[in-house]
């Protein structure tokens, strides 16, 4: 079973501003995120002796973990640069941090994801023909959902989308790839997020409110989506089964869900794959209000990639930490003790599911 040591916990979660950060390079953004996470738990940055980060897509660098370490003035005993894809990158960072601390390679680890994707100079990339990818009408009809517009970002002062949106606004947005419109697609964002981990014993000694990772599971089924003959048989369901089994819970036992939402259809697929609702029922589940604040299991109360910012899904994890510590402000889910976080990299190429809990 893919269990995670309960003797290592998350004690700090930090975010930079998101949106446009002109003039800031990725190393500055990542450093800012680490500083915010350290401040969140009252840690001095020089106490960090483990550093795990992302090599930015905007302007790729070699040895970027040592670049960031040098910029922060650290002398870490453990370094790693991770890129698995989407929120699964953040999960893999956390797994490495747990292993590094548990094995004595470091005592305090920082995991950081951030870059200047919006204002930087990303290399050319080939676009995806989403209509061909999704198969057109066969995706629209089973789910019956033409658009999911979340108001949660209005409750998040650090969100890129801060204006209310009506159904008329949504329907007036241009079609990108039928049935997906502009507002079915996530943001392009500058920004960063970071997490601080240490042993449970050290956290207790410091009097810190902590969050544990109860379980984590992943599965990769392909790289190119052309190698997936059936788009309804993806790694998300397998990762979810493993993560829930290892945690000894099911989706109904979670009080909040942070699901990767690069596109609205990603949420529909994930809700069904993880068993929050049955096949073809995700649209009904959302329209019934089960995923709204005050509903059965609120979904992405920070606004997600669609409305807060697309920082590779790292802000899904920082939001989970805030929800479980009761520090999410106006968007706090009352009584949140357990969160389910999902991620996918590429076109569901690699899928991951993580169960997180508030420490008692």
Give the residues covered by each predicted segment:
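Conserved beta-strand elements of the Class I
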Residues: 9, 49-52, 110, 255-258, ...
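Metallocofactor- and cofactor-centric catalytic cores in central/energy metabolism, strongly enriched
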Residues: 5, 21-32, 44-53, 59, ...
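Generic N-terminal amphipathic, Lys/Arg-enriched alpha-helix
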Residues: 7-22
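Short, surface-exposed loop/turn segments at secondary-structure boundaries that line and modulate
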Residues: 55-64, 220-223, 261
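Acyl-thioester C-C bond-transforming condensing/cleaving domain
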Residues: 2, 43-45, 62, 74-232, ...
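A short beta-alpha structural unit
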Residues: 51-54, 216-219, 255-264, 305
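Phosphate/pyrophosphate-binding loops at sites that engage ATP/ADP/AMP, CoA/4′-phosphopantetheine
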Residues: 35-48, 239-253
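Feature representing long, continuous alpha-helical segments
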Residues: 238, 242, 252, 261-269
């Amino acid at each position: 079973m893919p269990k995670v040591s309960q003797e290592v916990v998350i004690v700090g979660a930090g975010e930079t501003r998101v949106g446009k950060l002109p003039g800031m390079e990725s190393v500055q953004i990542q450093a800012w995120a680490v500083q915010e996470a350290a401040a969140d738990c009252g840690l001095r940055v020089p106490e960090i002796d483990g550093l795990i980060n992302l090599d930015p897509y905007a302007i790729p660098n070699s040895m970027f973990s040592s670049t960031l370490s040098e910029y922060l003035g650290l002398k870490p005993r453990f370094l790693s640069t991770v890129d698995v894809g989407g929120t699964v990158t953040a999960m893999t960072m956390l797994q490495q941090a747990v292993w590094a601390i548990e094995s004595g390679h470091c005592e305090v680890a920082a995991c950081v994801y951030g870059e200047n994707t919006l204002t930087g100079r990303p290399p050319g990339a080939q676009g995806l023909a989403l209509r061909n990818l999704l198969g057109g009408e066969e995706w629209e009809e089973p789910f019956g959902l033409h658009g999911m517009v979340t108001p949660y970002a209005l409750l998040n002062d650090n969100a890129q989308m801060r204006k209310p949106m009506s159904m008329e606004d949504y329907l007036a947005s241009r079609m990108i790839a039928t049935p997906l419109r502009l507002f079915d697609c996530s943001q392009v964002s500058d920004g960063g997020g970071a997490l601080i981990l240490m042993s449970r014993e050290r956290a207790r000694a410091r009097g810190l409110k902590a969050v544990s990772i109860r379980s984590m599971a992943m599965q990769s089924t392909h790289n190119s989506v052309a190698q997936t003959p059936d788009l309804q048989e993806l790694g998300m369901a397998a990762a979810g089964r493993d993560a829930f089994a290892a945690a000894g819970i099911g989706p109904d036992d979670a009080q909040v869900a942070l699901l990767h939402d690069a596109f609205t259809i990603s949420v529909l697929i994930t809700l069904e794959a993880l068993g929050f609702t049955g096949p073809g029922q995700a649209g009904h589940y959302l329209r019934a209000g089960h995923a709204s604040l005050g509903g059965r299991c609120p979904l992405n109360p920070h606004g997600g990639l669609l409305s807060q910012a697309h920082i590779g899904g790292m802000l899904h994890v920082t939001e989970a930490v805030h929800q479980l510590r009761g520090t999410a402000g106006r968007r706090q889910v009352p009584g949140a003790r357990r969160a389910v976080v999902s991620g996918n990299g590429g076109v569901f190429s690699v899928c991951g599911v993580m169960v997180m809990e508030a420490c008692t």
